[in-house]
Amino acid sequence: MTQKSKSSKVVTLILMILAMNTIYMLPYLMYTYYTPLQEAMGLIGRDADYGRLLNVYGIANVILYLPGGWVADKFDCKKLLIFSMVSTGVLGIWEATFPSYTILLLIHVLFAVTTVLTFWSSSVKCVNMLADDGEQGGMFGSLEAGRGVSGLVLTVMQQTQQIAQKL
C-alpha cells in the first residue's frame, strides 16, 4: 500500500465522520432547541404532537433499516451518500419554513428515508470498502472514535457559545 492510498483513506474516513455527525443533526435539533422550535412550529402546549415528530422518525427508521442494506448493495454507495446529504439538507430547509403539522410529519418520515434508507447502510458499506480485510476493525473503530470526539467538540463549542450569550 502506498503512502498516498493511506492518506486518501484517512481523508475519506474524516469526510465520513463529518457526514455521519452532520446528517443526524437536523432530525434531532428538536432536543437541543426544544422550546424555540416548539414556539416556531406553533406547538406550544402540545408536547405530545411535538414528540410525535420524533416518534414517526423513529418508527420509520426501524422499518427502513432492513431495506437500507438492499439499497446499499443495489446502488453506488458514493452516489447514495451524496443524495442523502443533499436531500437531508433540502428537507432541513423545508422544515425551516415551519410548514403545517402534517407536512412536518411527512418531513420526518422523509428524514428517515434520507438518513437511514439511503445513508446508514451506504456509509457502512463505504467504510467497509475503504479498508482491507485486516484493517476493517481498526477502520470502524476509528470511525466511531472520530464520531465521538467530533461530537464532543461540537457539544463543547455549542455549550461555550450558550454560556457566552448568557454573560
Regions found by a protein language model. Give the residues of each.
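Hydrophobic alpha-helical transmembrane and interfacial-helix anchor sites in secondary transporters
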Residues: L37, V71, M157-Q161
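Cytoplasmic helix-loop-helix junction between adjacent transmembrane helices
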Residues: I107-G146
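C-terminal ends and interior cores of transmembrane alpha-helices
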Residues: V86-S100
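Central cavity-lining transmembrane alpha-helices of secondary-active solute carriers
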Residues: R52-W70
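Pair of pore-lining "gating" transmembrane helices in MFS-fold secondary transporters
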Residues: K6-Y33
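Glycine-rich segments within core transmembrane alpha-helices of 12-TM secondary carriers
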Residues: G137-I163
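Membrane-interface helix caps of multi-pass secondary transporters
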Residues: L26-G45, V127
